[in-house]
Regions:
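N-terminal secretory signal peptides that target proteins for export/translocation
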Residues: 1-17
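Acidic, polar low-complexity linker/tail segments
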Residues: 38-90, 95-104
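Von Willebrand factor
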Residues: 84-191, 193-197, 203, 227-239
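Bacterial N-terminal signal peptides
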Residues: 19-30
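DG-centered beta-turn motif at the end of beta-strands
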Residues: 66, 94, 130-133, 181, ...
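VWA/integrin I-like adhesion module and closely mimicked acidic/polar interface patches used
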Residues: 200-249
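C-terminal "exit" segments of structured domains
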Residues: 39-44, 260-341
Length: 341
C-alpha cells in the first residue's frame, strides 16, 4: 500500500485553499505485480468498472453476476478478476484559449491544480505520459522520460503566463488529438487509457467520434475525462453531451464539470469540507482508471468491430441497488489496433 499526501501550489489568491484541498486529496493505490499483456485473440480481457448508487466501486462480484448477450462476439464469461497488468495513462491537457474561463476567473489555476494532482498519483503499477494540445498536439512528455520530467514540465506550465494559448477560433480539436494520443501507446492493450482534461468543446475535428471509437476497439483502450466549465451559468455555453457519450462508449468515466467557483478551490470556511468531498470523488475516479477489474471473455472469430452487450444479472442488480457498469461498448478484431500513423 502506498500512502501519498500531495500539495499543489497554484498561482493566485487561492493558494491557501488549493494547499488545503490537495493536502486532503491523498489516494492509496495497491502495489501489485504486473500481469502479461493481451495476447490471445480468443480470450479477450474486457476492462469493467461497476459502481453502486453512491458511486463507490464494487469489487465483490463474480463472473456469475454478469450476462453477455452477443451472438456475433460470443456468450462465455470465463472469469472476473482484479486487473493486475501495468496501466499506462496518456494525459491529454487542453491548453486552448477557452480553458482560461471568464474574464477575472481563476479557471486555469483550477485546471493546473487538477492535472498536477493526477500526475502525482503514485502506484508501482502505473506509468504516465503527457500531451499538450489545442487544434493539434503541441508537445509531449513520453513514458520513457519518466514521472519526474512530466511533473517538472507541468510546474513550468503553471508558472508560464503564455498558457493557456489564445487562438484565432476553432482551436480545440479533441477527436483529432485523441487519434494522435493513441499513437503514444506502443502495443496498446485494454490496460491502457487516455485521460483528457478539457472543457469538452470540440471545434472542427476532421476525425469523427465513431472513427476514434473504432480505433480504440481493437485494444479496448478506454478514454476518461476531467471536465472543467469555462462558462458557468452562461446560456451560450456549448453542449458537451456528445463528448460525454463518447467517453462512456469507450468504457471510461467523466469527472466534473468543475468550475472556478467550486468551493473546494476557494479560500473560505467551506473549503475543508468541500475538499474532503472532492477527495473521495477523485479517489473513486482514479481507481476506475488504475484499479479496474477485467472480465475474461471467450470471443468468436470476428471480422469487424462488434457491439458488446454486457449487463448484470437481476440478482446482482437487486443486491447493489441502482448500480452502474462501465465497459467498452465495442470490441474490435486483434488487427484493428492500427498503430500506424
Amino acid at each position: 500500500m502506498i500512502n501519498s499526501n500531495w500539495s499543489v501550489l497554484p498561482v493566485g489568491n487561492e493558494k491557501s485553499a488549493f494547499k488545503l484541498l490537495f493536502f486532503v486529496l491523498g489516494l492509496s493505490l495497491l502495489c501489485r505485480p504486473a500481469m502479461p499483456q493481451d495476447g490471445n485473440c480468443e480470450k479477450r480481457l474486457l476492462p469493467v468498472v461497476v459502481t453502486d448508487k453512491d458511486g463507490n466501486r464494487v469489487t465483490t462480484l463474480t463472473s456469475a453476476d454478469f450476462r453477455l448477450d452477443n451472438r456475433e462476439v460470443g456468450t462465455n464469461v470465463l472469469s472476473w478478476n482484479a486487473d493486475l497488468r501495468r496501466h499506462r495513462v496518456v494525459i491529454l491537457l487542453d491548453v486552448s484559449g477557452s480553458m482560461h474561463g471568464l474574464p477575472g476567473s481563476h479557471l486555469w489555476n483550477v485546471v493546473m491544480a487538477l492535472v498536477q494532482h493526477v500526475a502525482s498519483v503514485e502506484s508501482d503499477n502505473s506509468e504516465f505520459a503527457l500531451a499538450l494540445f489545442t487544434d493539434r498536439v503541441l508537445e509531449t512528455v513520453d513514458f520513457a522520460q519518466g514521472r519526474d520530467a512530466l511533473k517538472k514540465r507541468l510546474d513550468e506550465i503553471s508558472r508560464d503566463p503564455t498558457f493557456p494559448r489564445i487562438g484565432k477560433g476553432h482551436d480545440t480539436k479533441i477527436y483529432d488529438v485523441l487519434r494522435e494520443g493513441v499513437h503514444m501507446l506502443e502495443n496498446p492493450t485494454s490496460a491502457d487509457s487516455l485521460l483528457v482534461i478539457t472543457d469538452g468543446f470540440d471545434e472542427g475535428s476532421k476525425t469523427r467520434p465513431d472513427e476514434v471509437l473504432g480505433q480504440l476497439a481493437g485494444p479496448m483502450i478506454r478514454v476518461f475525462a476531467v471536465l472543467v466549465d469555462p462558462l458557468p451559468g452562461e446560456r451560450s455555453r456549448p453542449d458537451t453531451g456528445e463528448f460525454v457519450r463518447f467517453v462512456q462508449k469507450s468504457g471510461g468515466q467523466v469527472f466534473g464539470p468543475v468550475d472556478a467557483g467550486n468551493a473546494a478551490f476557494r479560500d473560505s470556511a467551506k473549503s475543508a469540507q468541500a475538499g474532503q468531498v472532492m477527495a473521495g470523488q477523485l479517489g473513486q475516479f482514479y481507481r476506475g482508471i488504475l484499479e479496474n477489474n477485467v472480465l475474461t471473455i471467450q470471443v468468436s472469430a470476428i471480422q469487424k468491430p462488434q457491439a458488446v452487450r454486457l449487463s448484470l444479472t437481476d440478482s446482482a442488480r437487486h443486491q447493489l441497488k441502482k448500480p452502474q457498469i462501465f465497459f467498452p461498448r465495442e470490441i474490435g478484431t486483434c488487427l484493428s489496433t492500427d498503430t500506424s500513423r
